[in-house]
């Protein structure tokens, strides 16, 4: 059973832009843990549409402010581009592909999504003030050894720069690039810096919570694609994409529709090949601020031992700020302490997402959903 701790520290952050401020975040839903039954039968997976077609062509890829604008737009619409850095790479291309799929555009089109991004994100940057809560959520002395971490109250951020970069869905080098002349590692409370104009991720607003089944969200289907490092979430029964005359199969389709069955997609880091458990499982529990059971034997061999440490909750926990366990014992989706490594490094066996993406999952899926790992 996962152990949890109640962390209910709230503080505000003033974020503002010269023309338009970053929007305030949606309320964070709540969750508690439940043990998954590894012997529970898996539900049959509903049919789901796949993201077919070529990735958007390189020649249409935006640069400069437009690149940041596009990444913010995709991020805010649940098509995660990875970290916001103004350098659209493969994850941004996959997010554009997903957005095009949903909206009925050619898979390799950049024009439609950029037009939408320019309308939705007129100002890609905002000015943010470092909140007073950093005094409780930044610990420069956070140890690296698991035995010492087990003695801590919380797995906090190691610097204000890390706190602010995760808050605004980017990494520290990009934050430094946006703020030339500022000593990004010497920030203090009430300092102001330029940040991507995204809805901020408020780690300090999270509390020990649990999520129950939901009639709509529990019927959805999660596809974890370990070949392209992406998780996609579908409605239980996607709508027909092509409307045609069944009595005249040789006739051209009447129309092509957007795939409204695709709900969201996010970049992931899958587990090491020897630990990946392919198949279809059930989402059993969703836990915010989980304590992590550090079992060296389990991580190295896949076999659970009785010699383990309990690592406290927090944004720098190896499982991040949320655990979404499946009916396959020990396998689940979770956050991470290193968002910049998503898609670039293997985890021990689970599916890692950036904390700002992982915490959105309870707004999209709930216990009872199927999780297909392929």
Model region roles, listed by residue range:
Residues 75-79, 97-105, 165-183, 198, ...:
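Sec-exported extracytoplasmic/periplasmic mature domains
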Residues 151-243, 265:
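Secretory/export targeting leaders with adjacent low-complexity proregions
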Residues 18-63, 67, 125-127, 247-251:
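Compositionally biased, proline/threonine/alanine/serine-rich low-complexity intrinsically disordered stretches
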Residues 8-19:
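Hydrophobic h-region of N-terminal signal peptides that target proteins for export
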Residues 205-334:
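Gly/Pro-biased beta-strand-loop elements
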Residues 54, 60-93, 132-169:
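Primarily a LysM-type cell-wall glycan-binding module
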Residues 300-374:
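Exported/periplasmic cell-wall-interacting domains
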Residues 90-136, 174-211:
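Extracellular LysM carbohydrate-binding repeats and other cell-envelope/extracellular binding modules
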């Amino acid at each position: 059973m996962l152990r949890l701790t109640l962390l209910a520290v709230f503080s505000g952050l003033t974020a503002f832009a010269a023309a338009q401020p970053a929007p305030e975040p949606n309320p964070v839903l709540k969750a508690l843990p439940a043990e998954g039954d590894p012997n529970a039968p898996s539900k049959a997976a509903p049919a789901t549409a796949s993201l077919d077609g070529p990735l958007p062509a390189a020649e249409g890829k935006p640069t400069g402010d437009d690149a940041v604008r596009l990444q913010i737009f995709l991020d805010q619409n649940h098509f995660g581009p990875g970290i916001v850095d103004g350098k659209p790479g493969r994850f941004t291309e996959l997010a554009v592909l997903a957005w095009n799929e949903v909206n009925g555009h050619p898979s390799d089109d950049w024009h439609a999504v950029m037009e939408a991004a320019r309308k939705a994100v007129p100002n890609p940057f905002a000015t943010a003030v470092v909140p007073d809560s950093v005094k409780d959520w930044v610990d420069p002395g956070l140890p690296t050894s698991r035995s010492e971490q087990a003695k801590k109250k919380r797995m906090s951020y190691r610097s204000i720069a890390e706190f602010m970069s995760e808050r605004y869905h980017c990494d520290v080098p990009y934050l430094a690039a946006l703020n030339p002349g500022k000593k990004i590692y010497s920030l203090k409370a009430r300092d102001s810096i330029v940040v991507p104009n995204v809805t901020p991720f408020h780690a300090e607003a999270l509390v020990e919570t649990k999520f129950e089944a939901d009639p709509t969200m529990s019927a959805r289907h999660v596809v974890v694609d370990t070949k392209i490092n992406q998780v996609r979430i579908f409605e239980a029964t996607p709508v027909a994409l092509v409307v045609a005359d069944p009595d005249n199969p040789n006739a051209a389709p009447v129309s092509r529709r957007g795939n409204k069955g695709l709900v969201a997609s996010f970049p992931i880091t899958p587990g090491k090949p020897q630990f990946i458990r392919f198949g279809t499982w059930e989402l059993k529990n969703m836990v915010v601020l989980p304590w992590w059971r550090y079992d060296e034997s389990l991580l190295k061999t896949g076999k659970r031992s009785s010699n383990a440490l309990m690592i406290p909750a927090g944004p720098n926990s190896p499982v991040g700020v949320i655990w979404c366990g499946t009916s396959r014992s020990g396998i689940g989706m979770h956050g991470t302490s290193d968002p910049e490594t998503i898609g670039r490094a293997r985890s021990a066996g689970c599916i890692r997402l950036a904390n700002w993406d992982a915490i959105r999952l309870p707004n999209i899926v709930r216990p009872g959903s199927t999780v297909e790992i392929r």
